[in-house]
């Protein structure tokens, strides 16, 4: 079953797991990131920006600071993963990043965890087979920990997580 970024966001709103940005049109932000990526913006990334996601649970979204005045724009962490063909999507709150894969050219690219301890040189583990599935997994993360879910609980939400090409899922990453 495939799920869109919009559907994932909608399903996270009811339990209050999703926080959205207030105000402002995403058009300038989308155009800015598209230009930064050389017009190679995955549809899921554009949908994510258009949804206005600020956080899912404790995971803060990584967004460039958009302003109509070019001299007031800031990329923030947006360029941090470009050398390894990824765009940062979320921070784990401890310096590591979740990044959307740009190397595959896939319509719905996977998302990987990049550890700051590795200096973001490679993906450490697969975090979701798509951005939509990552959103659902992040929304369930605290509950899974609190409930003591076994390794691999992510498969119940994201059945394709084990087929991500650049890194294994967390329970196989060692």
Locations of regions flagged by a protein language model:
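A surface-exposed partner-binding patch
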Residues: 1-105, 163-174
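General N-terminal targeting signals
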Residues: 58, 62-66, 105-106, 128-130, ...
